[in-house]
Amino acid sequence: MDVSNLPSLVTRLKSMVVAGLLLACAAGAQAAGCPALLDRSMPRLQDEKPQTLCQYSGKVVVVVNTASYCGFTSQYKGLEALYARYQDRGLVVLGFPSNDFGSQEPGSNQEIASFCTSTFGVKFPMFTKTRVSTSAGADVNPLYAELRKATGSAPRWNFHKYVIARDGTTVESYSALTAPDDNAFIERIEKLLAMP
């Protein structure tokens, strides 16, 4: 065995170990920056491609289950206005169509996407049709299962809202009766946006 190459071999091995450690630290830092509640991917409504919710870390997140044929469907307009008004300050609205209540979301993902954009000009992120009700059992969307666990409150109808604070752990629940333009709701959103 030629030992003259040993120092260069050791140097290369050290470089590879250091590079591996740096990559592992970077991956760990990324995962550490994402709260457990948002550490998941969901398929987008428009193309069904997975989208990580970690990208919303550090934002105030309004999660709402939606339906196209509900008495509360007009809340899309208020949700879009809320999103447009506060997105530059760190708010995002995430819509999750569901057919769980009154079968008021019977369409396909493409039909729902078309309805949302053509009827209400929805630009906030929307995800594929999902199950949000406690009656869904094991089929309930895992994000909704965690939101229910965090608040002790499950959606009882379409347009139930959860608000996740920037810390990713503080969660509040609002029934469908709370409109997106409700003064108390807006005040709470503004307080959460003002918090680090």
Give each language-model segment a name:
Residues 142-196:
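Thiol-/selenol-based redox modules, centered on thioredoxin-like
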Residues 52-54, 84-85, 150-155:
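Surface-exposed acidic, glycine-flexible loop patches that form ligand/cofactor-binding
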Residues 2-17:
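Bacterial N-terminal signal peptides that target proteins for export
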Residues 72-140:
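Structural microenvironment flanking redox-active thiols in thiol-disulfide oxidoreductases
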Residues 65-69:
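Amphipathic alpha-helical repeat scaffolds
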Residues 30-54, 74:
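N-terminal "domain-start" segment that seeds a small globular fold
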Residues 57-61, 87-92, 120-125, 158, ...:
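Loop/turn elements at helix/coil->beta-strand transitions in domains of secreted/extracellular proteins
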Residues 14-26:
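Bacterial N-terminal signal peptides
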